[in-house]
Amino acid sequence: MARIKRGVIAHARHKKILKQAKGYYGARSRIYRVAHQAVIKAGQYAYRDRRQRKRQFRQLWISRINAAVRQSKMSYSNFIFGLKKASINIDRKILSDIAIFDLLSFNALVKKAKEALL
């Protein structure tokens, strides 16, 4: 029976994990067993946060729109409802960009939303 030698494969696998753990603090970047756990945990955090990023950006856009709309003495919910009634379909990302970079256009949208509510 032939002897199976797999030291090369194990070494390559360890090197791969330690390369992924580069920049981690202390033993997490030097010791394979700890580094392996850290890399797995980092992957879990990355997976979770890729989903949370979408929620967080939507929250940011909504708070920016809300702040801009309140300068015109209107609430965010009424503004969105007014836009829907006026059949203006602009998503929140674009609305927040307009609110930041083009206040005149945003005020025109607020005016249209107010007219649609009356």
UniProtKB/Swiss-Prot annotation:
| rRNA-binding as UniProt keyword | yes
Q: Which GO terms describe its biological process?
A: ribosomal large subunit assembly; translation
* A Pfam family assignment: Ribosomal_L20
Function of the protein: Binds directly to 23S ribosomal RNA and is necessary for the in vitro assembly process of the 50S ribosomal subunit. It is not involved in the protein synthesizing functions of that subunit.
Q: Tell me the keywords, alphabetical order.
A: Ribonucleoprotein, Ribosomal protein, RNA-binding, rRNA-binding
GO molecular function annotations of the record: rRNA binding; structural constituent of ribosome
What gene makes this protein?
A: rplT
Q: From which source organism is this entry? A: Buchnera aphidicola subsp. Acyrthosiphon pisum (strain APS) (Acyrthosiphon pisum symbiotic bacterium)
Q: Which GO terms describe its cellular component?
A: ribonucleoprotein complex; ribosome
Designated name of the protein: Large ribosomal subunit protein bL20
What family name appears in the similarity comment? Belongs to the bacterial ribosomal protein bL20 family.
Tell me which positions the record assigns to the signal sequence: none
